């Protein structure tokens, strides 16, 4: 998701590239920094957690003016339904990352669909748009009916009714739907769902081959209603588990933090003068994350803790700009993330020299549920040598989508680019490898529990 704003002027905030309708974004190879004033424009970007469909959206609610331009249209009169179809076609034409369009002639497809697909009613037009996008064979470039677009926006705002599962595809050819991350404290996490679990059925409906939006619809529902989810651990299809879950409406608290005192020597940085560690848990990147993280790092910096533990385990991403903002709080200079499309590197987001704490020893906890904007953050901290990455390899979700609003309230999520770390590593399907191998469950995620373990004989060696 990434649309950024005038690269030639000073700033654009970064995570989710900004929003200048992606369609209007021009190639920019110079480094761009961002200002706090740009923050609000970034807030509508990328996916979010409670049943957040794992899109990795970068501009989740970006309104893009999709003009028909000068492209030649059929000689016959164009109906209002066909105009809506053309809006969707043009959104992909302008922004899609693969300019070969999966080996198809995008212009020829437009003409073919206008001539052959019935578009007399809105439902038929929607169906024609879905068929057009299916040609791309890209599960993340999808049509969003008005209700689904509204649900996506609610997710990036921080609350949604569901069972607390963020879902995505497994990356293989089977189109299995897997748990990207269970939302902390959500019904699914409490029932034992884990990152990487394969979802088999939802209320008896087999989900393999369904779109993520269809599965999301099955999982969402009225607050306090029940839903049955059958799943299994990766590689163990014969060992299914059945979870009886109660849907809840929650507001996601993106940041929690504390100071752990009397920390065991094994968990401290070498030569630490204090037995204190600052622990910051980032559960998601939503519209509240930047301000909350700023408060956390500012307070811990004032305390002069011996080290920082940044926990982004099971953080499935969210607003790309928030991920970059957090990186800027910890890194004072250098590149943080590269945005690449079919033509190569198009944008570079860098530190802005206004970090809160760029010196305190830092370890970043990750696992297979660390994805998208969280991987951007982990990659930035690793490649800048700001901190050690501890845990297991992250998920590997590096595609960027932007959501283009259509005139009737529907939208199209379009894959527009991909993330790369400052060292040029393509995150997608690869992830970020840890510097320190660590059992991802060695530390709890609640504040009291993590301090208890860090102060015990079971404290892990975090800083190498």
From Swiss-Prot:
Q: Which reaction does it catalyse?
A: The enzyme shows specific recognition of a C-terminal tripeptide, Xaa-Yaa-Zaa, in which Xaa is preferably Ala or Leu, Yaa is preferably Ala or Tyr, and Zaa is preferably Ala, but then cleaves at a variable distance from the C-terminus. A typical cleavage is -Ala-Ala-|-Arg-Ala-Ala-Lys-Glu-Asn-Tyr-Ala-Leu-Ala-Ala
Q: Name one GO molecular function term.
A: serine-type endopeptidase activity
Identify which top EC class this enzyme belongs to.
Answer: hydrolase
What main location does UniProt list?
A: plastid
User: pH dependence, per the record?
Assistant: Optimum pH is 6.2.
Active site per the UniProt annotation: 372, 397
Q: What's a GO biological-process term for it? A: proteolysis
- Mind telling me which GO cellular component terms the entry cites? chloroplast thylakoid lumen
Statement: the UniProt record of this protein carries the keyword Plastid: yes
Q: What activity regulation does UniProt give?
A: Not inhibited by antipain, 4-amidinophenylmethanesulfonyl fluoride, aprotinin, chymostatin, 3,4-dichloroisocoumarin, diisopropyl fluorophosphate, E64, EDTA, EGTA, iodoacetamide, leupeptin, pepstatin, o-phenanthroline, N-ethylmaleimide, phosphoramidon or phenylmethylsulfonyl fluoride.
Q: What happens when the gene is disrupted?
A: The LF-1 strain contains a frameshift causing a premature stop codon within ctpA. This strain is unable to process the precursor form of D1.
Provide the alphabetized UniProt keywords. Answer: Chloroplast, Hydrolase, Plastid, Protease, Serine protease, Thylakoid, Transit peptide
Residues of the transit peptide = 1-32, 33-77
Where is this gene product found?
Plastid, Chloroplast thylakoid lumen
Specify the PDZ domain's residue ranges.
Answer: 149-234
Q: Which domain of life is it from?
A: Eukaryota
**A Pfam cross-reference name:** Peptidase_S41
Protein purpose:
Protease involved in the C-terminal processing of the chloroplastic D1 protein of photosystem II. This proteolytic processing is necessary to allow the light-driven assembly of the tetranuclear manganese cluster, which is responsible for photosynthetic water oxidation.
How this chain assembles, per its entry, is: Monomer.
**This protein is called what?**
C-terminal processing peptidase, chloroplastic
Q: Which organism is it from?
A: Tetradesmus obliquus (Green alga)
| Lineage of source species | Eukaryota, Viridiplantae, Chlorophyta, core chlorophytes, Chlorophyceae
